[in-house]
Amino acid sequence: MSDSISRPSIPRRPKKQLQVDLPNHSEGFDRSDTESDNEQMVSLESLESNEASDKIPVIPKRPDRSKSSSKSPSLPAIPKRPQKSDTSGVESPSPSDLPEVENEEENHKSIYDESVSSKKHSDDAIEPPESSEFNYEVGDRSDVDVSDGDKTPGNTNTKTSIKEDLNITDDNSMHSFDDDLETVLQDRDDNGSSSIGPEISQDNNVPSSSESDINAELGEEYTDPDSNSQKSCGNRDKENDELSTESDKRNPNERDQSNKSEEKTIKKDQEVSNTPKVTDAEASEDRDSDNIPHIPRRPKKSKSATSEPDAKSIEVENLDNTNIIDQKQTQTNKDNNEEAYSINETSESKSETPQQEKNTTKPKAPPKPKKLSSKIAAFQQMFNQETAPPRNSGTSKSTSKPDLETKNSENKEVPSRLSTDKMKFAQSLQGMMGKGIAMPGMVNPNFHQKIDTEEIESPDKEVKISNMKRGIAKGPRGKKLPKSLKNPVNVEVTPRFNSFVSTIWELNFQADTKSNDMEGSENVSNNTEAQKSENNEEILNLENKSEYIMDSESVSNSTPASDIKEIREESSPLKIDDDDVYSEIDKSKTTQSESRNLESIDSTEGSRNIDAENLPEEIKSDNDSAASYPKKSEDSDLDLDDNEQHILENQESDLNLRKED
């Protein structure tokens, strides 16, 4: 087991050789550099003192930072390290170191498990000088990290050294320390929670040595390396004892895991150890040298040591908080489930109670039917009944349902072929189904219902009208209308037009009008005949008298055309109207005119016959002209009607006949 423990420390020894060679070159530098070197030496001293307390598995994370420093772009700052005093001068790592560091990064957890398992077996498995040199190498790499500034999270020792360097350089850059806390939590989850207790106990032992180191740093005095090395060895022995006791308490499962991890790390370390064999041999020789006192000069380990228990306490508190939160969540879930269960119970209980109430209300008997005094009562009765709502009017339903009940009561003795369920179903369909369509010649089945409803509704309406009370329209009290408004006003409208009533025409329906006309015509004819006879007698008497004989000149002068015309107009015995009816004729006028005409005619004829022979030729010509004058006038001036000419012709014919007789 001792060989297996020494193998993981092999890659870290070559830097021990660099540290031994560098102090010879660092004698002629300033005091400022020596002070910083002293501080770093004190930090190394604190690392050596707390190695056992912080467990060896913390160591492998230092090489990670050396790798980052070697690969970082800040490599030009490396040559300044040899200026430091005897404490620790660091050069850039050789190319042979880089693969070692990479392997260490991959296997830092396996080394951690191997170191723990080695402490289980024996306290003498780890030699104090080897462990001191191992920590010294870690300190040198931490110095490189301070210059470069690129840091990766590591275990507890790396955390403390990082925090110390950050406090020296920048007080504000604390992000790397926070990252280390997260890595610690992850490591504990992987390795188990059993390692929390021993780490806390180890950290409690650290501050005593760290405080003394801090005082030495403040006074800038260097303590003897031998005394510090002895103290560190004593502390290691105590820590190994504690680790052995704690390892016995661990579960067997953890031991199996640690054994497996050791086997893996051994294989990887063998591959790594093939290249740096020379450096390991030189480092083993340097361990025996007296330059080891540089290790105990890390006093600022105390600050990190004090911070570690704080971090551990924070982790414990976090775990407690998580447990408390889980408990609270479980309690809240339980409470929610209980509340939901209680709500469901209450809802079920509420739903059950109305069902029970409904069940209790169903068996109650319906109220006694009352006489239907109005439609409202019939409407209420329809709702009280449990049957389905039919389509017909409420009154017909209300009348039909009691009839069904009476029929059922009468037919109780007769066993029904249908079951009770079917009977109920049929009763419920009575109002829903129609009576069908009436065939031709049949009476409409709904006609009787309409008649019944009208008969029932008519007395109700009459009663309502008789019971109605008219509201009295009351005007505003305490006010009276003026008299001008109380008395009625008669408005008379005068029409625009004056209307006159008169009979414009009449119709007389007489059947004897034609007979009267015929009689009138006969009378006229008789009168004319009598007149003609009388005229003839007068003419005969006048022929015998000479008084009526006149000269042709006197006749011609006395009878102008106008007089002749008037005479003929007056001598006309008849006057014919537009209706071809004879008017009354004055007999006296006709007789006188006729007599005058006859006399004038006779006188003219006699004068012509008598005087024509005795007169001279000059006179004859004059007489002829005078005699012809009246004829011309008669022809030219007299324009007689056809009737008048006819009468004259008749007269002349009569006269001629008489003369012949």
From Swiss-Prot:
Region (Disordered): 1-421, 454-486, 512-661
Localisation per UniProt entry: Cytoplasm, Cytoskeleton, Actin patch
Primary location group: cytoplasm
Comp. bias (Polar residues): 39-50, 85-95, 192-213, 319-334, 381-399, 590-607
Domain of life: Eukaryota
GO cellular component, one term: actin cortical patch
Compositionally biased region (Basic and acidic residues): 106-124, 138-151, 161-178, 234-271, 400-421, 454-464, 563-576, 643-661
Keywords: Cytoplasm, Cytoskeleton
Function: Involved in mitochondrial migration along actin filaments.
Record family assignment: Belongs to the AIM21 family.
Name of the protein in its database record: Altered inheritance of mitochondria protein 21
Lineage: Eukaryota, Fungi, Dikarya, Ascomycota, Saccharomycotina
Designated gene of the protein: AIM21
